[in-house]
Amino acid sequence: MESTTLSKPFKNQVNPWGPLIVLLILGGVNPVTLGNSPHQVFNLTWEVTNGDRETVWAITGNHPLWTWWPDLTPDLCMLALHGPSYWGLEYRAPFSPPPGPPCCSGSSDSTPGCSRDCEEPLTSYTPRCNTAWNRLKLSKVTHAHNGGFYVCPGPHRPRWARSCGGPESFYCASWGCETTGRASWKPSSSWDYITVSNNLTSDQATPVCKGNEWCNSLTIRFTSFGKQATSWVTGHWWGLRLYVSGHDPGLIFGIRLKITDSGPRVPIGPNPVLSDRRPPSRPRPTRSPPPSNSTPTETPLTLPEPPPAGVENRLLNLVKGAYQALNLTSPDKTQECWLCLVSGPPYYEGVAVLGTYSNHTSAPANCSVASQHKLTLSEVTGQGLCIGAVPKTHQVLCNTTQKTSDGSYYLAAPTGTTWACSTGLTPCISTTILDLTTDYCVLVELWPRVTYHSPSYVYHQFERRAKYKREPVSLTLALLLGGLTMGGIAAGVGTGTTALVATQQFQQLQAAMHDDLKEVEKSITNLEKSLTSLSEVVLQNRRGLDLLFLKEGGLCAALKEECCFYADHTGLVRDSMAKLRERLSQRQKLFESQQGWFEGLFNKSPWFTTLISTIMGPLIILLLILLFGPCILNRLVQFIKDRISVVQALVLTQQYHQLKTIEDCKSRE
C-alpha cells in the first residue's frame, strides 16, 4: 500500500454495516430487462477489460439472462496491457502473443536473442511481463507464502469505503479495502461481487512460463451477491496490487456483460401461408403453425407399420414421450406437474443446433420416402449448422454455413435431429438436389409444442382465487430440453444402464413425434387435389377438435386454450380430469379446515354474502335508532317541557303586572 503510517495486515477488516449497505444499493438498481420472457436465450459474452476499458479476455455462450456465471480465467499480464510501465506491456495490444525472448543466459556468456535477466531479482520496478523469465518470477511472487496479491472493489463499494481512494491508488489507498485475493492474511468479504485466486499452481505455471506463454492465469468467480446484481452490462471495476516489499505495484481491471439477441424466430418450409399468419405487430414474431394432426396412429418402436390408432392414443403417446424425456433430464420438475397440448398452432418447434452429420455415397435407410415430411416448421430458434445457399432472411439461424462439394452423396442428420429445409423436414439431404435447386437446410432438434405448468398455477386457475397482474410465462419442452440432443441424450450418456435408459426414453419421444407427423403427412397427401396451402392450414387447425374430444372424454383438463395432463413420478395420469377434481377437492378441504366458522359460513353460502351486504346498512341504522332513540326522545321532551314552562311563567308574570297597575290607579283615586 502507499500509506506509510499503516502496517500490512494479517486479516481483512470488514465493516459490519457492509452487507446492509450493499443490499440497499442493489435494491435501488433497475435491472436490465430484455424481452418479456425470462427464459429467452441470448448470446452472452463476459468480457474482462484492462484499465483503458479494452477487452483483453472474453468467453461467449447462449443462455437465458442472469443464469450463466462461468469462471473467468484471464492472465494477470493481460490485465496489465497498456498499464503502468513497471509491467512492461504499456505498448502491447490486446490479444497479442506474449513478448519474448523465450530463453535466457547468465551474466557471463550471452546468447543472441536471449534475455539476460534470468538471475536478476524481481524488484518493485522490474518489468514483470515483458519476458518469459520475468513472468516466471511474477508467478513465484503470486504463489509465495509471504507474497501474493490482493484486490479492492471500485465504485460499486459501499459508502463507508470512500477512504479506499480511486483509480490512482487502484482503489486500495488504505488497509481494509481489500475484499479478495491470494495473500497470507486471506482477504475476504461478505458483500463483494467476485473472488480472485490463482488458476495454476506454481509447479504448473513453471513449464508454461518457460514455453513463452501467458502463465499467470487467474480464476475469477462470481459470489452470491455478484449473481444477484443485474448491472453487469455497464460493468464493474477493481484494483489489483501485488504484495511485495516496498511499493505495491498495481493495475485496474473490469468485468462487463455483453448481451446480444440470439435472433428472431424464423419459419422454414414450403408453405408461405403459414409464415404470414403471425401478427406483424408483435415485437417477437408469434408462432405460426407447423404440423398437426387429423388421422391417428399408435407409437410402437419396433413395428415398421404400426396399426392405425385413435386420436387418444396418438396424442397421449406424444405427451408420454415428452414426460419421459423431461423426467430423465429434470426429475425435480416431474414430481408433480401438468403437461399441456396447445389447441392453436404451432404444434412443433425447432431448435437449431451444431452437429456432425454423416456422409454417405448411397442413400441410408433413414432416407426412405416414409420419413420425409413436406411440412412447414414455422418456428426455429437458436443458431446451428446450415447447408446450401441460405438467404439473408434466414442467415440469423446459422452459426456455421457449409458449402457442398462436387459429387452425389447424402448427408444424414445425427440421431435425434433432422434437417429443416425450404422444401420440408427430412432426416437426410441429397447434395445433387441442393446443386440443382436453391434449397437450403438447417440442422434442428424437433420438439412437440408441449407446455409445462406447475400444479399451483393450474389449481389457482380453476379456483379463481389468484389474480395475476401479468400472465406467467409458459415453459415449453423446447425451452426445457432444447440442445440436449447434441449434449448426449441421443448418443447415450457414458456407458451402461444410464445410457440405455436415456436412449430408449428419448427414442420413445422421437417415435411418437414421427407417428404424429406421419399421420399429418398422410392427410395432406389425401388433400393434395385442393389448394396445398389452404389444406395444410385447415388440417393443422383440426388439432383443436382432437383436443376437444380428449376433454369431453375426461382424459385432459381444459385450461384456457390448452389440454392438460397430470403427471408425477409414477407417470402420466390417464384420467386427468378426475385427478384435477380430486386435487381441487383436497385443496378445498384443506382451505376450509384452516378457516374459522365465520369465514366458512360465507364461503359455503355465496348468496349469504350478498344478502348481508344488502341489509347491513338498514340494520345498523335501525340498531342505532333503538339504542339512542329513547335517550334523544327524552331529551327532546324535556327540552319542550322546559320551553313550555318558561312561556307559562312569562304569561303569569305579564298578568301579575297588569293587576298591580289597576290596583295602583284605584288607590290614587
UniProtKB/Swiss-Prot annotation:
Motif CX6CC: positions: 556-564
Chain coiled-coil ranges: 502-538
Location of the region described as Disordered in the Swiss-Prot/TrEMBL record: 266-310
Pfam families: TLV_coat
Region (Receptor-binding domain (RBD)): 32-267
SUPFAM superfamilies found in the cross-reference section: ENV polyprotein, receptor-binding domain (SSF49830), Virus ectodomain (SSF58069)
Intervals of motif YXXL motif: 656-659
GO BP: any one term: virion attachment to host cell
Keyword field contains Aminoacyl-tRNA synthetase: no
Lipid sites, type S-palmitoyl cysteine: 631
Stretch list, region Immunosuppression: 539-555
Cytoplasmic side stretches: 633-669
Sequence positions that bind Zn(2+): 117
Keyword Transmembrane helix in annotation: yes
Example of a GO cellular component annotation carried by this entry: membrane
Glycan-modified residues: 43, 199, 293, 327, 359, 366, 399
Cystine pairs: 77-129, 103-118, 104-114, 152-172, 164-177, 209-215, 337-340, 337-564, 367-421, 386-398, 428-441, 556-563
Annotated transmembrane regions: 612-632
Topological region Extracellular: 32-611
GO MF entries: metal ion binding
Motif position, CXXC: 337-340
Subunit description: The mature envelope protein (Env) consists of a trimer of SU-TM heterodimers attached by a labile interchain disulfide bond.
Role noted for this protein: The surface protein (SU) attaches the virus to the host cell by binding to its receptor. This interaction triggers the refolding of the transmembrane protein (TM) and is thought to activate its fusogenic potential by unmasking its fusion peptide. Fusion occurs at the host cell plasma membrane.
Cross-referenced PANTHER family: BC035947 PROTEIN-RELATED (PTHR10424:SF72), VIRAL ENVELOPE PROTEIN (PTHR10424)
Domain-related comment: The YXXL motif is involved in determining the exact site of viral release at the surface of infected mononuclear cells and promotes endocytosis. The 17 amino acids long immunosuppressive region is present in many retroviral envelope proteins. Synthetic peptides derived from this relatively conserved sequence inhibit immune function in vitro and in vivo.
Protein name per Swiss-Prot or TrEMBL: Envelope glycoprotein
Organism of origin: AKV murine leukemia virus (AKR (endogenous) murine leukemia virus)
UniProt lineage: Viruses, Riboviria, Pararnavirae, Artverviricota, Revtraviricetes
